[in-house]
């Protein structure tokens, strides 16, 4: 068995040393970008369409060796971990990927230009490891880099994308994590880091697709904040890093939470924000472990554990295999939870679920126990005199007429599943027109009945903030409803605002394919003529799967 190494002398070097290497290899501009935590609007832009490879329709779940072992990866470690996951309840709980990180390969390619596994670490080769992992019903992941060398200095995929993809497929690899070190920016004169990233990651996407093997694709470049993958990576990868490398302490976990929580608009089935691996059991307290797992699940983040699973300890396993919390992360609606409120280090997050329930996390960032509260209406619930709260960590149930509150320990989280009443699309938010990259907008924020809606640059104004409740889409805190003009049900009917009156022409269905249909007419909310200019009107039109009929809510 591979002995877990001391993080201070072994794997402990990984984030500090890897970041230092990245800084040196990316240059001063990227170094400055890494130091600053980005400030991101809660609804900054519509998500890019998902990759569409049929993979990761819920956030990937698995294990990666790097956080606990660094470069001390081996065939024995990977196979022992796979066997442990098979035996200890993790596989049954939904974990499926066993992922090898950096340092698995030899220091150079062979005479044919192929990557070669380090024979001392992987004497039987990667294909044999894949066969073993597959025999347990699990899947194997591997690591590479978009640059000329990996972050630890091993051969990168730059210029070898097609060759490496074919090799990975021939080995039976199911998941590729591709890093962002040693990028030859000189080959891309005049291009930004983001433009280079788009080019290189798209190359590997296409190479993987051409193999015919389903390989989930994970981009690891969010730590270079100038790349901002959440704005463009939906059609390129199944998940993308949004943050710097996580460390096994509360401060690091909190930083990654702060960066990732504001990116909910960019996540969805097949395309996920990744705030980095879980550090459960790697040094945080039991309370902090529970908080991290709650937050990652609420944010629909990949659940990739980075600890020692051969000897994990019962408390670590109890967190990692909490099926009620995992069910929130894996919910088929595919919504990332959003921040309802955040004041004085007391956070409330809400995540709508496919069956109409809402998951709520009350998170205490501070060093003292605090009472944190919200309401059913604030999390998108309505239409009931009572709601049932299920504590997802204790299993206890309670009822409330509307107030949701708990005493939350320092650095801790309380997580509820709220049932009852009707559920809208969660907290009020912008509605994005996917094809145009603009927002559903009431012109000049007027409140005049009969005003036709348009699309306009997203600015977070009152005429762009919509809430969903009881099948209605409302603006101005419920004062006006989205309305089909004069109860008409024909193509070209204008969509307007009107006083909410319970009419059938004010009932709307937000569909999983991104369309919004009028319940009365069966027609789709449509940007006229597939226009993209500010002021283009919105109408009803027969549904045709056009991008001008796709919207993202919340």
What residue spans do the PLM features occupy?
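Carbohydrate-binding surface patches
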Residues: 296-299, 304-306, 342-381
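Aromatic-lined carbohydrate-binding/catalytic grooves of carbohydrate-active enzymes
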Residues: 81, 85-189
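Aromatic-lined carbohydrate-recognition surfaces of secreted/lumenal glycan-active proteins
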Residues: 138-155, 205-226
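Secretory targeting and sorting signals
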Residues: 2-50
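Structural recognition of the beta-strand scaffold that forms the well-ordered cores
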Residues: 57-65, 94-101, 139-144, 174-179, ...
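Glycan-recognition surfaces
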Residues: 163, 213-308
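C-terminal beta-strand-rich structural cap/linker in extracellular carbohydrate-active enzymes
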Residues: 400-424
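Extracellular glycan-recognition/adhesion modules and their associated mucin-like linkers
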Residues: 422-447, 462-489, 506-532, 550-554
């Amino acid at each position: 068995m591979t002995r877990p190494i001391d993080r201070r002398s072994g794997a402990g070097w990984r984030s500090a040393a890897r970041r230092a290497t990245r800084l040196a290899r990316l240059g001063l501009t990227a170094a400055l970008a890494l130091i600053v935590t980005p400030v991101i609007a809660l609804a900054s832009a519509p998500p890019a369409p998902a990759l569409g490879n049929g993979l990761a329709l819920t956030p990937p779940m698995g294990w990666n060796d790097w956080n606990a072992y660094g470069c001390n990866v081996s065939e024995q470690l990977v196979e022992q971990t796979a066997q442990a996951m098979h035996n200890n309840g993790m596989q049954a709980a939904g974990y499926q990927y066993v992922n090898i990180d950096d340092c698995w390969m030899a220091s150079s390619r062979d005479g044919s230009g192929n990557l070669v596994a380090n024979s001392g670490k992987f004497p039987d080769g990667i294909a044999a490891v894949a066969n073993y992992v597959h025999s347990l019903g699990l899947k194997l992941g591997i690591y590479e880099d978009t640059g000329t060398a990996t972050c630890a200095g091993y051969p990168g995929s730059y210029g070898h994308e097609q060759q490496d993809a074919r090799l990975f497929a021939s080995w039976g690899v199911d998941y590729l994590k591709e890093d962002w070190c040693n990028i030859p920016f000189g080959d891309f004169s005049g291009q930004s880091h983001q433009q280079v990233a788009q080019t290189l990651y798209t190359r590997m996407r296409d190479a993987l697709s051409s193999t015919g093997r389903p390989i989930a694709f994970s981009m690891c470049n969010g730590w270079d904040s100038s790349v901002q993958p959440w704005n463009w990576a939906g059609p390129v990868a199944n998940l993308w890093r949004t943050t710097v490398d996580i460390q096994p302490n509360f401060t690091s976990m909190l930083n990654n939470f702060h960066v990732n929580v504001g990116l909910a608009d960019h996540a969805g089935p097949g395309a996920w924000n990744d705030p980095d691996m879980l550090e459960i059991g790697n040094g945080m307290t039991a309370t902090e472990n529970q908080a991290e797992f709650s937050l990652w699940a609420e944010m629909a983040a990949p659940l990739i554990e980075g600890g020692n699973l051969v000897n994990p300890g019962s408390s670590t396993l109890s967190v990692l295999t909490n099926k009620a919390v995992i069910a929130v992360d894996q919910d088929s609606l595919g919504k990332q939870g959003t921040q309802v409120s955040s004041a004085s280090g007391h956070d409330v997050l809400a995540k709508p679920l496919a069956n109409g329930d809402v998951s709520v996390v009350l998170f205490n960032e501070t060093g003292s126990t605090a009472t944190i509260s919200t309401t059913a209406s604030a999390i998108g619930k309505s239409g009931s005199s009572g709601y049932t709260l299920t504590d997802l960590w204790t299993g206890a149930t309670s009822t409330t007429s509307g107030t949701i509150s708990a005493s939350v320990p320092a650095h801790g989280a309380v997580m509820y599943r709220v049932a009852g009443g009707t559920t809208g699309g969660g907290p009020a938010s912008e509605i994005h027109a996917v094809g145009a990259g603009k927002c559903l907008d009431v012109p000049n924020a007027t409140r005049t009945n009969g005003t036709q809606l348009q699309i306009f640059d997203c600015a977070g104004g009152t005429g762009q903030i919509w809430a969903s409740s009881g099948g209605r889409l409302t603006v101005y805190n419920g004062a006006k409803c989205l309305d089909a003009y004069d109860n008409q049900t024909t193509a070209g009917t204008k969509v307007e605002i009107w006083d909410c009156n319970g009419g059938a022409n004010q009932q709307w269905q937000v569909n999983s394919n991104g369309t919004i249909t009028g319940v009365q007419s069966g027609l789709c909310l449509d940007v006229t003529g597939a226009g993209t200019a500010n002021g283009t009107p919105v109408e009803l039109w027969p549904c045709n799967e056009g991008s001008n009929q796709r919207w993202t809510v919340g």
